[in-house]
């Protein structure tokens, strides 16, 4: 508050003013006043103590530790300042320094149990789980002194639950947290711990139940935190990283809910969940929220996503998933050199944050670019290991069912699902090597080898359909794979990818099932009309892309006049149908037409030429703000903004038409 910092404070009012600011949680303003006062009296115990407290509340833990270090030096007889310093260093993730300061207090019986708790927390954060467990059990047994009695039993049980969670014993952690919650009553952080354990054991419904309770109580008890305001479109002020926000566990709950929705492939809901959380400025966001924002908005804003993940990698600490996710995304966007560089520069992170499976998988993906045969062998080794695990787990499920052991069934099924999630990407990476070579029979062979495990998996079925479709003599077989995917979502057909619908329509046409193709197109048209009625400004491309693909098919077969006419009609009205993707399909047909005209391989009627010129004129008019090409997110040399438009490419195509038919002579 500028006025406050610049105003003259009356004599005798300074202390009262500072305490009022602290009472009202206006810590930043208190820091300003205390900083000015300490310039005049740098050894003031009261000033340093209050400044350290304010820094701690502002989560400026390193600065708080500096204040308490000064106090410890000025007043060595008051050992509580050493404890506060150690706690602040721990919060700042400076674990060796925190351990060193805490060790000096171990001989003081008054602080013994608190120091043990702090040391247990430090070891837990450093990943030394046996060391942490030993200290927690020491406290629970009463060896921590008088303070470690009944009051700390709850803390001890929670700590044991956290250790079980870190050890991967999620069911046991759930039991521990649940029992503690029943004994102590509702606590937001404890309820979150339970939800997290349920999430990790894939019990999403139970996790969402506890998340809902955290959110409902947070909204009811603290309406000032503005939950949901950003999603509703209100322009709201940041609530900051206050103690109240931390105590509600709302940020953690929203992040976990977003992760669950993302796992369930409800991507829009996941994005909305992140905007529902209490509003904060970007510089105030915690690492987990920043990581999740990057991940969930990657398709829409990839450049921003990469920047956030790269930034997080420089922080200490960062969410453990950051390293692996950044590498996977580099590979997804085909920045293999960057992925290789990051792996080489961060060998220490490789062993800490990548499982052997993930490291081998990334290594194979990177190798694909220079030595595809070697990469295929690496992927084959991974696939072989995973198929053995799948067979073993299938046998375990069968045995558990025979013995009617529900717990064993659940455990084996969860392990099977996790192994399948590893197997599918390996399989797809193998198939992609042959796909890139347009060797579709070999892609089909790779998929057929995996039918034992994957015949019910949607991703596998979709890609089998694509490879059958691309072989051009297996349209009937492709229909057998596309149809179940479409029928599964028939009531919400626009949830199906437009290219799947287009390929199914083409397959129907190529097998003389024109009635089925027309029925499917009528269904798409009906749903688009309904959506257009509900939201007149919404752009919808499904039927347009289906018609574009059919038009492309006719052009490929040499029937350009019918194909081009279909393409032109598919983009009407232009304000709703013209987009980067639809323009991509349309211009390919026009380029093919112009190539064949320039070689004098085809003759086109003047009326069709006139129709083409008119169409390109409309695209020129409506395509001013539509990118012709979506640029790669990390491209150093960006395309000229004025040239990367549908308008510019329309003009170029029109000029080519004039040149070929001689209108410009």
Curated annotation (Swiss-Prot):
Function (record text): Required for polyglutamylation of axonemal tubulin. Plays a role in anterograde intraflagellar transport (IFT), the process by which cilia precursors are transported from the base of the cilium to the site of their incorporation at the tip.
Compartments where located: Cell projection, Cilium
Keyword hit for Coiled coil: yes
Lineage of origin: Eukaryota, Metazoa, Chordata, Craniata, Vertebrata
Alphabetical list of InterPro entries matching this protein: TPR-like_helical_dom_sf, TPR_rpt, TT30
Annotated protein name in UniProt: Intraflagellar transport protein 70A
Main location: other
Family per record: Belongs to the TTC30/dfy-1/fleer family.
GO cellular component, one term: intraciliary transport particle B
Alphabetized SMART domains for the sequence: TPR (SM00028)
Coiled-coil stretches: 508-535
Keywords: Cell projection, Cilium, Cilium biogenesis/degradation, Coiled coil, Repeat, TPR repeat
Natural source organism: Homo sapiens (Human)
Domain of life: Eukaryota
Keyword S-adenosyl-L-methionine found: no
Example of a GO biological process term: intraciliary transport
GO MF entries: intraciliary transport particle B binding
UniProt TPR repeat ranges: 11-44, 45-78, 154-187, 189-221, 393-424, 425-457, 459-492, 544-577
